[in-house]
A protein has these predicted regions:
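Class I S-adenosyl-L-methionine
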Residues: 1-107, 115
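Short, glycine-/small-residue-rich phosphate/pyrophosphate-handling segment
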Residues: 117-126
Length: 126
């Protein structure tokens, strides 16, 4: 049985994606996400199966990622910013329930708040 990486891809460009996120996306068989986020990464990771669902279909998207992993595929569920801050990580764990399968690995990303503060010259220090 494979796993689900819940991947925070940062605020929207490859330069702000973590090395760990890049590795998870390179390793996966399937990239699942909101269409805009899938579009942001698909050209960098050719040959991947791409699955997307529209806005308001977050639970369905997470369930699809879990089902794909249960079928033996390694899945990257992509989220903007950090996957644990208004991302899909909590929902994936909730939908998986108390089962230990499929394995879930949360890959944090750069939050939009931190990125925005840096761009504006106003880092979030106080």
């Amino acid at each position: 049985m494979a796993k689900v990486f819940v991947v925070g891809i940062g605020p929207g460009n490859y330069e702000n994606m973590t090395v760990r996120a890049d590795r998870a996306l390179a390793e996966c068989d399937v990239i699942v996400g909101y269409p805009v986020y899938v579009d942001l990464v698909k050209n960098r990771y050719p040959g991947k199966e791409l699955v997307s669902t529209p806005m308001t279909q977050e639970a369905r998207r997470c369930q699809m990622a879990l089902e794909l992993a249960k079928s033996g595929k390694t899945v990257a569920l992509v989220c903007s910013g950090d996957s644990g801050v208004y991302g899909m990580a909590a929902l994936v764990y909730a939908l998986r329930g108390e089962n230990s399968e499929p394995e879930v690995e949360v890959v944090p990303g750069l939050t939009a708040a931190c990125s925005g503060g840096a761009v504006l010259g106003a880092p979030l220090t106080h």
